[in-house]
């Protein structure tokens, strides 16, 4: 499981002209990709990492500040563009495998006490954010 984590000062996701998820103020925008061997245990591990990673201001975490997270599925995180001119998606898990695992990341975050907004799985989304720093890290579990 792979996540691109961005420290933000507000973020939102729009589907078909409707805002389906948004966070205000300091928090994290998290793009989550799932591969074939990912499990519910890895989803829980990723959730714990996202909740506790100290990348907000003054080396604080979302759990320290009760900061919100916007979690968005993104299968293209497992794209491979090393050969040719088009990426392949062979390493990305199919939707019926990936969707419940992204949902599990969200459920685990909420169980930890996090405020979580989400995108819509499989939809064409427009993501807007103010990257604070900029500060972006890749997390793999």
From Swiss-Prot:
The UniProt entry lists the main location of this chain as cytoplasm
Q: Which Enzyme Commission number(s) are listed?
A: 3.1.1.96
Its transmembrane ranges are none
The sequence motif named Gly-cisPro motif, important for rejection of L-amino acids is recorded at 133-134
Pfam (any one): Tyr_Deacylase
What UniProt keywords apply to this chain's record, in alphabetical order?
Answer: Cytoplasm, Hydrolase, RNA-binding, tRNA-binding
Where it sits in the cell: the answer is:
Cytoplasm
Q: Which InterPro entries match?
A: Daa-tRNA_deacyls_DTD, DTD-like_sf
Q: Name one GO cellular component term.
A: cytoplasm
Look up the record and give one Gene Ontology term from the biological process aspect. D-amino acid catabolic process
Reaction it catalyzes: glycyl-tRNA(Ala) + H2O = tRNA(Ala) + glycine + H(+); a D-aminoacyl-tRNA + H2O = a tRNA + a D-alpha-amino acid + H(+)
One Gene Ontology molecular-function label? tRNA binding
This protein's source sits in the domain of life called Bacteria
Keyword tRNA-binding tagged: yes
Q: What does this protein do?
A: An aminoacyl-tRNA editing enzyme that deacylates mischarged D-aminoacyl-tRNAs. Also deacylates mischarged glycyl-tRNA(Ala), protecting cells against glycine mischarging by AlaRS. Acts via tRNA-based rather than protein-based catalysis; rejects L-amino acids rather than detecting D-amino acids in the active site. By recycling D-aminoacyl-tRNA to D-amino acids and free tRNA molecules, this enzyme counteracts the toxicity associated with the formation of D-aminoacyl-tRNA entities in vivo and helps enforce protein L-homochirality.
- Domain description from the entry? A Gly-cisPro motif from one monomer fits into the active site of the other monomer to allow specific chiral rejection of L-amino acids.
Question: Which family does this protein fall into?
Answer: Belongs to the DTD family.
Q: Which NCBIfam families match?
A: D-aminoacyl-tRNA deacylase (TIGR00256)
Partners and quaternary state?
Homodimer.
Full protein name: D-aminoacyl-tRNA deacylase
Which organism's genome codes for this protein? Streptomyces coelicolor (strain ATCC BAA-471 / A3(2) / M145)
């Amino acid at each position: 499981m792979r996540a691109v984590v961005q420290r933000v000062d507000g973020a939102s996701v729009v589907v078909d002209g409707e805002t389906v998820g948004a966070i205000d103020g300091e928090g994290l925008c998290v793009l989550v990709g799932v591969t074939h061997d990912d499990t519910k245990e890895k989803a829980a591990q990723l959730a714990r990492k996202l909740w506790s990673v100290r990348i907000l201001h003054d080396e604080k975490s979302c759990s320290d500040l009760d900061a919100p997270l916007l979690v968005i599925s993104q299968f293209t995180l497992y794209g491979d563009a090393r050969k040719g001119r088009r990426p392949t998606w062979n390493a990305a898990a199919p939707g019926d495998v990936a969707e419940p695992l992204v949902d599990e990341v969200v459920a685990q975050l909420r169980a930890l006490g996090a405020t979580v907004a989400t995108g819509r799985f499989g939809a064409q989304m427009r993501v807007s954010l103010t990257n604070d720093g900029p500060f972006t890290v890749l997390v793999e579990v």
